[in-house]
């Protein structure tokens, strides 16, 4: 099923990219365990990594620090490798409240969670691809270091069906129930099956657009066919099919029975300890809760919070690391840690926070001590499990530099010839008035400005001051959620306003080519917001514009400022020299404004490989902002016809999507007229 990695790009490596690709590949082939790619903003780091993957033909996991960046990377990798398995593995919780106990108020908080169906399907698709194929790139968040089902048990539970196989209908249904598929003859959806005579329809848990039809004759599999679950149209007939479990946490019955005995033994030992310490209430609570869970496991094969017994279910010893996504990655796999200066500290912090909460639950009799082994990986365990690793960052941390032995692969020259911003240091006394005049110069030529302050109060006051002086300004702060944050950044790029004020605007990986000025107020106040790495990241936000400039307001030059200025000047010098030698004129990036949220929320839709008649007649896209009234009118008529067509085909979701798009277009038409 695997194909060779085939890179799809109109561009060839240029600037520092060819040398970076060569050095990274040589390092991997020489067996180097750790390498660091220091790639400046806008130098095409993702393209470099895609070239390395394509040249070496190795399965790869890319770790990103958050869901937003993971979605952005997933979209880019999907474009680079359209014919290969590019998968997305992040936490499937839209909302998650872990169980916790607060002793001071005697409050127990039950676990509460809301699971995103699309992301759950994509996680299952990711592990399936890793088990079946070599041409796989999985883009993951730090969710990858959390416990997952044991790959050996997961493989044992699979149901293999082949044409001509002797198996009766009841045996298939029993196996599907073991895989946690539910029978539903009315609503056919992911992770369910239905039975009609001697035909069983199965909707695989990892699929979003294809289902399996098993036609039996007597006790023999007569035909296997793939069909569209929406229209029922047969897509193809196949000789064999493997059905994967509905969840990563399925366990064979014999393993559950064995685990129950081990849980009973631990319960007896723990009860004894609690009684010896005169903790009668805790002993009673633990006994009641554990026996209820055991009863559920005996009857149903699982219980609420079964992950707390994962050590027994996977047959691990006390303190052993849990199985994670790393266990699904082949031994010769490659790990790429994106924005490593943020991701690596995150990995280190996950275990400690989880441990503190669980210790309280164990101490007060809500959980058995074995629940402590349902946890993310410790940092040392992550290091031991990680295959050959490439750390990617514009500002690598000390850990990455130390692991790479100080041998860093530089990617400083951009293919576009763009230079790092010019840096100026100006006095604090006149910073606000000076900033106002700089903003007016930029706004006049349709360029944008980012301003970063040290405190929330200062950001609010500055925003108010700029508004009073007639500037179009918005304020970005920690109370704004991810969705609204991305909308604000999109509006800045579209020119809805000119200035964005914030406290920590150095969000890694954000592409804003329209920003030509970054102003850093109180740059001489040492601290984590004004450290060398923070300053370089913030300055880098203006590196995608031909007129990029950074103004640091400070009365003295701190060591962090000196290092940041020195590093930026080193890069700028190297870039200028390269441009002169190769006759390159810097060109601004004309990058279209893509709504990253649409990618994050509807990410599963990009996986559709074509669905026969059920395929939407129109894919909802971003409404073009520069259409003439005549073109808008034409587009409206076209979409109205398509909407009616969808409604006639009973495809109401697609019709509703077009209806929403029509609202936007009509508003634009009225404004343009």
From Swiss-Prot:
Residues 633-668 form the UVR domain. Coiled coil: none annotated. GO terms for molecular function: ATP binding; ATP hydrolysis activity; DNA binding; excinuclease ABC activity. Keywords: ATP-binding, Cytoplasm, DNA damage, DNA excision, DNA repair, Excision nuclease, Nucleotide-binding, SOS response. It holds the Pfam family ResIII. Its main location: cytoplasm. Residues 608-627 are annotated as: Disordered. GO terms for cellular component: cytoplasm; excinuclease repair complex. Residues 431-597 form the Helicase C-terminal domain. GO terms for biological process: nucleotide-excision repair; SOS response. ATP binds at residues 39-46. It is found in: Cytoplasm. A motif (Beta-hairpin) lies at residues 92-115. InterPro entries: Helicase/UvrB_N (IPR006935), Helicase_ATP-bd (IPR014001), Helicase_C-like (IPR001650), P-loop_NTPase (IPR027417), UVR_dom (IPR001943), UVR_dom_sf (IPR036876), UvrB (IPR004807), UvrB_inter (IPR041471). Residues 26-415 form the Helicase ATP-binding domain. The beta-hairpin motif is involved in DNA binding. Belongs to the UvrB family. The UvrABC repair system catalyzes the recognition and processing of DNA lesions. A damage recognition complex composed of 2 UvrA and 2 UvrB subunits scans DNA for abnormalities. Upon binding of the UvrA(2)B(2) complex to a putative damaged site, the DNA wraps around one UvrB monomer. DNA wrap is dependent on ATP binding by UvrB and probably causes local melting of the DNA helix, facilitating insertion of UvrB beta-hairpin between the DNA strands. Then UvrB probes one DNA strand for the presence of a lesion. HAMAP family: UvrB. Forms a heterotetramer with UvrA during the search for lesions. Interacts with UvrC in an incision complex. This is UvrABC system protein B.
């Amino acid at each position: 099923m695997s194909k060779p990695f085939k890179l799809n790009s109109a561009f060839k490596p240029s600037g520092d990219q060819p040398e970076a690709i060569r050095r990274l590949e040589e390092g991997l082939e020489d067996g180097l365990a750790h390498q660091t790619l220091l790639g400046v903003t806008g130098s095409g780091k993702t393209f470099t990594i895609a070239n390395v993957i394509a040249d070496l033909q190795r399965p790869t996991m890319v770790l990103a620090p958050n869901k937003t960046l993971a979605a952005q990377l997933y979209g880019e990798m999907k474009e680079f490798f359209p014919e290969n398995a590019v998968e997305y593995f992040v936490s499937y919780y839209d909302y998650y409240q872990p169980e916790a106990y607060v002793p001071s108020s005697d409050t127990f908080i039950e676990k509460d969670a809301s699971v995103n169906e699309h992301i759950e399907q994509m996680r299952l698709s990711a592990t399936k691809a890793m088990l079946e194929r070599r041409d796989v790139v999985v883009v993951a968040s730090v969710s990858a270091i959390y416990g997952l089902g044991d790959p050996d048990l997961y493989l044992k539970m699979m149901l293999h069906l082949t044409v001509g196989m002797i198996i009766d209908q009841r045996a298939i249904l029993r196996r599907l129930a073991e895989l946690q598929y539910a029978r539903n003859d009315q609503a056919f959806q992911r992770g369910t099956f239905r039975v009609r005579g001697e035909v069983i329809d199965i909707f695989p848990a990892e699929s979003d657009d294809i289902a399996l039809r098993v036609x039996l004759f007597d006790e023999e599999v007569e035909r296997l066919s793939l069909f569209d679950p929406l229209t029922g149209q047969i897509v193809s007939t196949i000789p064999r099919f493997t059905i994967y479990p509905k969840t990563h946490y399925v366990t064979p019955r014999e393993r559950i029975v064995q685990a129950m005995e081990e849980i009973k033994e631990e319960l007896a030992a723990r009860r004894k300890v609690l009684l010896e310490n005169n903790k009668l209430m805790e002993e009673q609570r633990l006994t009641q809760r554990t026996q209820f869970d055991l009863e559920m496991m005996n009857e149903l094969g699982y219980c609420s919070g079964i992950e707390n017994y994962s050590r027994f279910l996977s047959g691990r010893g006390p303190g052993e690391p849990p199985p994670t996504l790393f266990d699904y990655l082949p031994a010769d796999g490659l790990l790429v840690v994106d924005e490593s200066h943020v991701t690596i500290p995150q990995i280190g912090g996950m275990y400690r926070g989880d441990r503190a909460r669980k210790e309280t639950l164990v101490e007060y009799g809500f959980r058995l001590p074995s629940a402590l082994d349902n946890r993310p990986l410790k940092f040392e365990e992550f290091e031991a499990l990680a295959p050959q690793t490439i750390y990617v960052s514009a500002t690598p941390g000390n850990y990455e530099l130390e692991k790479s032995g100080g041998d860093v692969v530089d990617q400083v020259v951009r293919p576009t010839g763009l230079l790092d911003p010019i840096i100026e240091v100006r006095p604090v006394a006149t910073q606000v008035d000076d900033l106002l005049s700089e903003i007016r110069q930029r706004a006049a030529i349709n360029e944008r400005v980012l301003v970063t302050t040290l405190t929330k109060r200062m950001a609010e006051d500055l925003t108010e001051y700029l508004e009073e002086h007639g500037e179009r300004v918005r304020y970005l702060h920690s109370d704004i959620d991810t969705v609204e944050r991305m909308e604000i950044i999109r509006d800045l790029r579209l020119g809805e306003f000119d200035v964005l004020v914030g406290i920590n605007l150095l969000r890694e990986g954000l592409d804003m080519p329209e920003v030509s000025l970054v102003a850093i107020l109180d740059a001489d106040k040492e601290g984590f917001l004004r450290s060398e790495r923070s300053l370089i990241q913030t300055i880098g936000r203006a590196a995608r514009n031909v007129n990029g400039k950074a103004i640091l307001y400070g009365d003295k030059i701190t060591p962090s400022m000196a290092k940041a200025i020195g590093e930026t000047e080193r890069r700028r010098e190297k870039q200028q020299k390269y441009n002169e030698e190769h006759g390159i004129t810097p060109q601004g990036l004309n990058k279209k404004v893509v709504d990253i949220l649409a990618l994050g929320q509807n990410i599963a839709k990009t996986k559709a490989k074509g669905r026969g008649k059920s395929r939407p007649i129109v894919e909802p896209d971003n409404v073009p902002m520069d259409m003439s009234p005549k073109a808008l009118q034409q587009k409206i008529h076209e979409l109205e016809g398509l909407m009616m067509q969808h409604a006639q085909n009973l495809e109401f979701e697609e019709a509703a999507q077009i209806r929403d798009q029509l609202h936007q277009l009509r508003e634009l038409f009225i404004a343009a007229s």
